[in-house]
């Protein structure tokens, strides 16, 4: 499964990432995407990442629309 990540850095990284996560979930709901793993994780001091692991058929649309900073294959 592919996961997309949006990275946030600095002293306000956590708050900014939480805010982005709300907008990510709104985007998924508005576009009638199925439930998928989304969340926030700490990558270290001053580095937060929002992640989304969409089904294959939604990956291209999410990547094109939201332009994640990085992705991983699991």
What are these regions (language model features)?
Residues 1-30:
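N-terminal acidic leader/helix
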Residues 4, 43, 66, 71-72:
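Small/flexible residues
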Residues 20-24, 60-71:
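Short amphipathic alpha-helices in soluble, non-transmembrane regions
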Residues 29-32, 68-74:
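Positively charged, polar, low-complexity stretches
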Residues 32-65:
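Short, intrinsically disordered low-complexity segments
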């Amino acid at each position: 499964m592919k996961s997309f990540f949006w990275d946030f850095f600095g002293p306000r990284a956590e708050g900014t990432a939480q805010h982005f996560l709300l907008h990510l979930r709104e985007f998924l709901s508005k576009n009638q995407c199925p439930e998928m793993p989304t969340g926030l994780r700490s990558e270290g001091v001053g580095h937060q990442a929002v992640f989304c692991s969409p089904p294959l058929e939604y990956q291209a649309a999410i990547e094109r629309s939201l332009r994640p900073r990085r992705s991983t294959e699991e």
